[in-house]
Each structure stands twice: as structure tokens, then as C-alpha cells.
């Protein structure tokens, strides 16, 4: 008896080790060391002050959406996931803003979910297949499936991973209490559902999945429909789940003031189409597309919004054959649900978690691969169920069974290689956007993101090319039009810049960033009154637009209205303390006015929010040097040079400090370093070095006399 227990324990440990190993081979093994924040990570984490500000702003975390905007704002997508945001914030507080460790935690959560899935399937009662084989094969497929790459390798996929964990825990609770779902179990499941909804809204479907699982595990499907209905009406736990779900939904809507999100056409062209038939047919086709991505995850793309999926405009579109095929399978499953309950259970566990993303409510995407993380649990169950049913039906044909085993091993190998390849794409934005261009060459958003990244990398030729291509594919793409205008402005083509920014405003008149950028162009043209009017228009559409206040300050500076300039810069940093240019302008103005003590005090405030910003540190060092606090100034200059070692100005000013300090040899070395970096830019260093050497020469001559 003990030997059997030991063997079972050993077998269990081996199975779990294999599953974890598959996860690590697909996503880990040193592949995370060079990981960066990509795509949605930038908005939700890097630029989200709820995540990367200390001390913790609890009010903001529980009143803002996942992207850092107020939940009650008209611009908010209403994606309320405060516990996910809080997880990111805790990681930032403990370990800093590092994509590698955040993605590693995602990988650990994926390992945990894989093991929970294996444990869940082992505990099921499904008479037509071996649950032991069903468990290990389904969990292995779940571990290796490429559709999970976005959820695991994209940091914002944490919401899906936590939803998946809570979903599986609730299903395990349901199985453990089959036939005796009392108030304690029901209450715990509803509590976990409420917690899950604070990680991801789709967790509201958990009670429905639990009811589905309990229905099949209790064998209610054997009864006649009349008897089933009578029994289900008397199940207090099912009624409790229904009322609890409605209560959670009501509370969730109340928290956002019962306002619905508004999405642009670029986010979801299907939902914005004016024809009911086109919307309906296209939405049905998208359902099949999601299934196809799980069935054949070769073509994967980080954004399917513009140009990836053509709308289905009539019933004769051949793509609807896939829709007919899917509903045929569902119909066959319904007709055989008493004979093949495992298939029906797997199908239900695939469909139920997907309902919030299925088009029942308007969402801000066409297809989002990470939303398939939890539905893929049911898909993996269904796929392996079909394989085992086919395999077990071929008992007399050993060659065929051998061929099936080989095919299964090949499938797992291909899946693992594809997942590893896709995980590499998600390491940085350049690889990610390049991979998307191969899948969706006519996706305007892909071209837009490539252009944006090229601009950041200084490749303006490439940026111009892809911005123009994005606009060619989608002429009313307001963000692309505005950014192209900004690019022309940086190249001094102000008239062309104004033209494109005005086109952006024609496409979207309530676009605050476009109004602000129009103001910047008009200010550069000397049209100060028009620029001021544009800035005020931007503030009309976004009242707390910190960057706009900064640019208004610059406008007043150009008009020599110094008090108003200072006031607007101060207002900008009050709204958003992470604006280094605004802080630098404030400090420079105070320094120029001779208010060095005020400049030091303000620089301390600035460094609390931006401790490693070189512009603020540099100005503080200059002020300290003027006040003859040489030791402290020297330390800050050295820190600035450590952060940016190839900046001639920093070495020059360090030389000036030593010059004033009568540290002649150190001054000479600093000046020479500045000249060696860039002789053309080190004019001041050359002049100061020449003066210093001449002075030393004169002193030497005097000494000789």
C-alpha cells in the first residue's frame, strides 16, 4: 500500500516538474535578461504615476483606471484593475522599474496556473477518457501554447494571469465540494470572484463557470430536461451565484458612475460600423478568428485593430464558412452532451470566460490575444479530449496509435518552438513591431508604432515613411497626422507641420494634444495670440494638461512675460511633478534672477520626484558653485558626468568649478576631457584652457625672475 502511495507521489512530482520545465523552456532560460517594457506596458506602468510614484497614492489606485486616468473621466476606458496596478506598484517600490523581474513574475504565475490546471483536471470525473492522461497532456498544451505569449511576456498580461489563477482556484473549490456546495464554499467563491474582478473585469464570469462545472460533475445531464429544470430551480447555491454576480456587476458599474467607455474607430472598427448586418457578421467572424488563433497560432500580432481583419459585409463572404463550422460543432456537442459530457464541459469552459470580450459589450479592441489566456483552458481541454477520444477508439490499430503519439509529440515540439520564438519578439518593441508588419502589413496602427519608435531612435527617414503609410491606409488617423506634423516641425517645416496638425483636428476636434502642438507651431511662427488661443482650447478639453501649461510658460517667456511664465511652469509641475523641462526652466529663471537660495530649495523638491535627472542636477551644481559650495557642487558634477559621460558642457562646467576653486590641475584635466569629446562644441573649454595655461605661464615667468 505504501509503495503505491510512494509511486503515486513520485509520478505526481515528475508530472509537475515536466510542466514547469516546459514553461521555462518556452519563456525562461535566460531569455528575460534583456527584456524591456513594450507596447501597453509603457502606458500602464512606465508612464503611470499610480505605479511609479512614492509614497503610495491609495486614493488614485482605487479611483483611476488601469492606464492611470480617472475612472470618471470621459477619456477613461473604464478598465478598473486596482489590484493589478497595486502589484506593479509594490514591485516598483521593492525592486524598481525593471521589465525583467516583472516578466519573470509573470512566468512564475504561468507555471502556477499550469499546475493548478493539471490538478483541476486530475480531480474531474469524466467517464469517457482517462483524466490522468487528459490532465498531463492538456496542462502541457496550456504551458506551451503560443497564444499565451502576450499574457506572459507582456507585463500588462498580469491581469489575465491573476484572473486565470483565481478562476482555477474557484473551479478546484467547486470540484472539492461537488454535491455539497454550501454557503461557506459559495461565499468563498463569490469573495474570490470579487477579488478577481479587481485584477481583471472578466472574472465576473467565474460563478458561471463554477455552475457549469458543478452541473457536469453532479451528473445532472443524465436527467430529463424537465427534471433538470426542477432540480436547478431548487439549487440555492446557483441562485446565490446569480444574485452575487448581479450584485458585483452593479457595484462595479456604480463605482464608475454607470458611465460606459467610449472608444475610437481606430480601436474597434467593427463596433463603429454603421451597418447592423456588417457589425453582426464581422463579430461572428471575429469569434472564429479567436478560435483559429488558438488552433493555429502561426500568425500572431500585438494589435489587430486597423487593417488586420477586413469587415464581413455580406452573407456570401466565404469567411463565414468558418462561422458555420464552429456553430456546427457546438450543435453536435449539444446533441451528444449526455454521451460526451467532457466535450461539452471543455467547450463551456472555453466559451464562458470569453463572453466579456465576445462583442456582447463594446470593447476597445478587435482581437486581443491576451484575453484568450483563460478561455484557452477550455480549448486545451477540448483539443486533448478529442485526441484521447480518437486515440482510445483505435485500440485495434497499433500502428495508427503510434502515429498519433508521434503527431502529438511533433505538435508539442512545434508549439514550444513557436512560443519561444514569439517570446523573443516580445523582448523589445523593435522586434515586436517588425513581427506585426509581417502578419498585418496593412495595419495602420502597426505603421504608426513603427514610426513612433523610429522617431525615438532618431531614424527620421523611416519615421516619415511609416507615418505617411499609416495615413495612406487610414486617412483620419488623428494621432499619426499629429505626430507627422510634429516631425515636420522638428525639421523646421512649420507650414507643413501646421497643415497636418489641422488635419488631425479635422478628424478629431476634441484632441487636446493636437491643439497644444498647434500652439507650439504657431508660437514658433511668432503667432503668439493664436498660439495662446490653441493652448486654451487644449485646456478646455483636458483641464489638468500639465505639458500644455509648460508650453504656455515657454510662450510667455518668448514674450518676456517672466512672472506669467514662472507661474505656468509651477502649475505644470504641481499637476505632474515628473516634468524635468519645467523644473529646469523654473530653476534657470530663479538662478538668472539671482535667487540662488530659492533655486536650491526648489531643486530639492524636483529631485524628490526626479532623483536622477541630469538637467536638474546640473543646474543645482551650477548654483552651488556660484555660492562657493565647491565640495557639494563637485560631487553633483561627477554624478552628472557618470550619468552622461560624453557631454562636453558637463566637463566644461566642472573645469570652471575647479578654476574658481583654484584646483588648477583638475581644471586643466576637465577642460581637456571636454575638448577630447568634441572640439567643435568645447569652445568655452578651449578658451578657458588657453587663458589658464597663459596665466600659469606668466606665473612661472614671474617665479623665475
Swiss-Prot record:
Its main location: membrane. It is an enzyme of class 2 (transferase). SUPFAM superfamilies: TPR-like. Glycans are attached at residues 57, 459, 688. It is a multi-pass membrane protein. GO terms for molecular function: dolichyl-phosphate-mannose-protein mannosyltransferase activity; mannosyltransferase activity. The keyword Transmembrane helix applies. It comes from the Eukaryota. It catalyses: a di-trans,poly-cis-dolichyl beta-D-mannosyl phosphate + L-seryl-[protein] = 3-O-(alpha-D-mannosyl)-L-seryl-[protein] + a di-trans,poly-cis-dolichyl phosphate + H(+); a di-trans,poly-cis-dolichyl beta-D-mannosyl phosphate + L-threonyl-[protein] = 3-O-(alpha-D-mannosyl)-L-threonyl-[protein] + a di-trans,poly-cis-dolichyl phosphate + H(+). The chain crosses the membrane at residues 18-38, 92-112, 136-156, 159-179, 186-206, 236-256, 286-306, 315-335, 347-367, 371-391, 401-418. InterPro entries: O-mannosyl-transferase_TMTC (IPR052346), TMTC_DUF1736 (IPR013618), TPR-like_helical_dom_sf (IPR011990), TPR_rpt (IPR019734). Belongs to the TMTC family. Transfers mannosyl residues to the hydroxyl group of serine or threonine residues. This is Protein O-mannosyl-transferase Tmtc4. It comes from Drosophila melanogaster. The gene is Tmtc4.
Amino acid at each position: 500500500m505504501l509503495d503505491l502511495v510512494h509511486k503515486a507521489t513520485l509520478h505526481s512530482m515528475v508530472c509537475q516538474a515536466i510542466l514547469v520545465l516546459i514553461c521555462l523552456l518556452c519563456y525562461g532560460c535566460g531569455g528575460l535578461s534583456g527584456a524591456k517594457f513594450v507596447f501597453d506596458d509603457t502606458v500602464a506602468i512606465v508612464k503611470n504615476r499610480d505605479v511609479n510614484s512614492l509614497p503610495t497614492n491609495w486614493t488614485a489606485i482605487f479611483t483611476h483606471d488601469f492606464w492611470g486616468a480617472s475612472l470618471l473621466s470621459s477619456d477613461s476606458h473604464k478598465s478598473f484593475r486596482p489590484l493589478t496596478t497595486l502589484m506593479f506598484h509594490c514591485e516598483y517600490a521593492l525592486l524598481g522599474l525593471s521589465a525583467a523581474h516583472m516578466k519573470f513574475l509573470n512566468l512564475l504565475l504561468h507555471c502556477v496556473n499550469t499546475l493548478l490546471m493539471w490538478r483541476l483536471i486530475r480531480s474531474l470525473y469524466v467517464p469517457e477518457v482517462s483524466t490522468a492522461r487528459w490532465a498531463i497532456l492538456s496542462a502541457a498544451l496550456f504551458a506551451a501554447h503560443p497564444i499565451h505569449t502576450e499574457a506572459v511576456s507582456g507585463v500588462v498580461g498580469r491581469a489575465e494571469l491573476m484572473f486565470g489563477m483565481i478562476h482555477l482556484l474557484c473551479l478546484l473549490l467547486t470540484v472539492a465540494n461537488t454535491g455539497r456546495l454550501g454557503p461557506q464554499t459559495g461565499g468563498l467563491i463569490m469573495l474570490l470572484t470579487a477579488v478577481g474582478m479587481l485584477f481583471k473585469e472578466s472574472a465576473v464570469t467565474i460563478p458561471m463557470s463554477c455552475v457549469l462545472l458543478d452541473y457536469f460533475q453532479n451528473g445532472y445531464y443524465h436527467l430529463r430536461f424537465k427534471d433538470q429544470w426542477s432540480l436547478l430551480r431548487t439549487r440555492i447555491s446557483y441562485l446565490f451565484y446569480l444574485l452575487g454576480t448581479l450584485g458585483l456587476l452593479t457595484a462595479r458599474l456604480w463605482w464608475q458612475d454607470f458611465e460606459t467607455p467610449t472608444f475610437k474607430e481606430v480601436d474597434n472598427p467593427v463596433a463603429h460600423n454603421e451597418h447592423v448586418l456588417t457589425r453582426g457578421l464581422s463579430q461572428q467572424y471575429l469569434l472564429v478568428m479567436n478560435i483559429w488563433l488558438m488552433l493555429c497560432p502561426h500568425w500572431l500580432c500585438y494589435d489587430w485593430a486597423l487593417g488586420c481583419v477586413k469587415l464581413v459585409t455580406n452573407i456570401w463572404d466565404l469567411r463565414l464558412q468558418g462561422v458555420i463550422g464552429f456553430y456546427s460543432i457546438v450543435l453536435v456537442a449539444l446533441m451528444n452532451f449526455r454521451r460526451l459530457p467532457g466535450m461539452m464541459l471543455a467547450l463551456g469552459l472555453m466559451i464562458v470566460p470569453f463572453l466579456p470580450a465576445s462583442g456582447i459589450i463594446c470593447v476597445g479592441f478587435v482581437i486581443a490575444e491576451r484575453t484568450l489566456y483563460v478561455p484557452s483552458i477550455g480549448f486545451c481541454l477540448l483539443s486533448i479530449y478529442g485526441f484521447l477520444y480518437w486515440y482510445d477508439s483505435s485500440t485495434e490499430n497499433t500502428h495508427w496509435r503510434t502515429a498519433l503519439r508521434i503527431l502529438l509529440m511533433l505538435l508539442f515540439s512545434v508549439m514550444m518552438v513557436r512560443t519561444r520564438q514569439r517570446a523573443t519578439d516580445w523582448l523589445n518593441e523593435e522586434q515586436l513591431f517588425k513581427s506585426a508588419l509581417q502578419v498585418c502589413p496593412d495595419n495602420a496602427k502597426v505603421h504608426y508604432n513603427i514610426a513612433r519608435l523610429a522617431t525615438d531612435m532618431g531614424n527620421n527617414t523611416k519615421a516619415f515613411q511609416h507615418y505617411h503609410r499609416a495615413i495612406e491606409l487610414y486617412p483620419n488617423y488623428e494621432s499619426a497626422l499629429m505626430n507627422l506634423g510634429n516631425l515636420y516641425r522638428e525639421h523646421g517645416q512649420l507650414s507643413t507641420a501646421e497643415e497636418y496638425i489641422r488635419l488631425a483636428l479635422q478628424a478629431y476636434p476634441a484632441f487636446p494634444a493636437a491643439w497644444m502642438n498647434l500652439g507650439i507651431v504657431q508660437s514658433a511662427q511668432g503667432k503668439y495670440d493664436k498660439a495662446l488661443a490653441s493652448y486654451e482650447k487644449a485646456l478646455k478639453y483636458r483641464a489638468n494638461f500639465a505639458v500644455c501649461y509648460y508650453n504656455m510658460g515657454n510662450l510667455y517667456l518668448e514674450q518676456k512675460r517672466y512672472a506669467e511664465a514662472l507661474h505656468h511652469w509651477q502649475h505644470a509641475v504641481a499637476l505632474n511633478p515628473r516634468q524635468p523641462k519645467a523644473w529646469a526652466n523654473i530653476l534657470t529663471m530663479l538662478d538668472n534672477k539671482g535667487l540662488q537660495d530659492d533655486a536650491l530649495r526648489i531643486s530639492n523638491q524636483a529631485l524628490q520626484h526626479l532623483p536622477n535627472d541630469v538637467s536638474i542636477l546640473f543646474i543645482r551644481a551650477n548654483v552651488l558653485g556660484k555660492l562657493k559650495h565647491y565640495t557639494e557642487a563637485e560631487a553633483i558634477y561627477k554624478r552628472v558626468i557618470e550619468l552622461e559621460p560624453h557631454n562636453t558642457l558637463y566637463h566644461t562646467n566642472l573645469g570652471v568649478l575647479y578654476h574658481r576653486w583654484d584646483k588648477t590641475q583638475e581644471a586643466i584635466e576637465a577642460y581637456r576631457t571636454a575638448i577630447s569629446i568634441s572640439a567643435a562644441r568645447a569652445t568655452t573649454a578651449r578658451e578657458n584652457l588657453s587663458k589658464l595655461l597663459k596665466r600659469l605661464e606668466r606665473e612661472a615667468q614671474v617665479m623665475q625672475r
